[in-house]
UniProtKB/Swiss-Prot annotation:
Origin species: Nostoc sp. (strain PCC 7120 / SAG 25.82 / UTEX 2576)
A Pfam family matched in the record: Ala_racemase_C
Family: Belongs to the alanine racemase family.
GO (cellular component) term, any one: cytosol
Name of the top EC class for this enzyme: isomerase
The protein's Enzyme Commission number: 5.1.1.1
N6-(pyridoxal phosphate)lysine PTM sites in chain numbering: K48
GO MF annotation list: alanine racemase activity; pyridoxal phosphate binding
Protein's job: Catalyzes the interconversion of L-alanine and D-alanine. May also act on other amino acids.
Annotated TM spans: none
Protein name: Alanine racemase
Amino acid sequence: MASHQQCDTYAWFSQRAWVEIDLEALSHNVQQLKQFLSPRTQLMAVVKADAYGHGAVTVAQTALQAGASCLGVATVPEGIQLREAGIQAPILILGATHTPEQIQAIAQWQLQATIGSPKQALIFSNTLETIQHDSPIPVHIKLDTGMSRLGTNWQQAGEFVQLVERLPHLDIASVYSHLATADSPDPGIMEEQHRRFEEAIAQIKTLGIKIPSLHLANSAATLADPRLHYDMVRVGLAVYGLYPAPHLQNKISLKPVIQVQARITHVKTIAAGTGVSYGHQFIAPHEMRLAVVSIGYADGVPRNLSNKMQVLIRGQRVPQIGAITMDQLMIDASALPDLQEGEIVTLLGKQGKEKITADDWAEALNTISWEVLCGFKHRLPRVGVM
């Protein structure tokens, strides 16, 4: 790897554990996605939750340079963080915002808001009137077409958009919705949500209201059906090089971006019958070489992976043994008798011909790769690698 972009106050090589972000892979993914879209369709890079654990500022800057048009975050502080880093691209707050403090911050930092109900629209307009904000705030109208989360029911789309259009201080930038089952091989529910979205847009057009932009597709829908691309797609997981579902893997070539690394801090020989870690969940069946790795569940390695996971050392798979502790975990290093303290262990990522992915962890944990990625804590420095 040619160079490192430091994302923490300490030198990357001095760390007990860290997360490497492959910025070339990230750029590749954005460019591949852009090529998959029509020239008229914009790409929003979703960088909420610290860019799914990858580091929001570095990811946002790289994604924009690679061709993303705008950014999506969940909260106002996430948007402010990007503005403070000097990012000028449009930033949409995908989550709910209601308080005067949130609305004032959106205005101050030139963010864009999701409006999901008439009540919220009125609160926004009244608050902006109170603070005497001069220019209108771009807002994105959220419709509920089947997710049963944020948004006004699609059947009331016309009257809802008409209300927002008439309110002072609000400028409608788009109408959008979110799909609940786009990653399913069965497209039935997605098709129904698509139909509802189309009917909602027809309602709005009947009233003579022009909407600058429409967006519906997440990563899965972007890969599954070009009819859902509209004017913009909101892509999160695919930007980070993961596929939302196995049946979508042949649609586009993506490269995983994240690599989680830690160091060997101690190596010892243990006798047969020796218990390892809390609760002695693992008992050595024979004499073994044991190595301690400087990463644990406080860093984002789930304790439920205890005795279920492997790590990579020198391009080989090595089993983890015993209960994963807060700051450390143990591995069976018997296959590497000359293993030395200070050597690097890969928990997620690639070494040689072997690789371990977030999907592997998700399968072992009976969860989803999104949760795995978002679990890596801030005490792991993010290091951008070119």
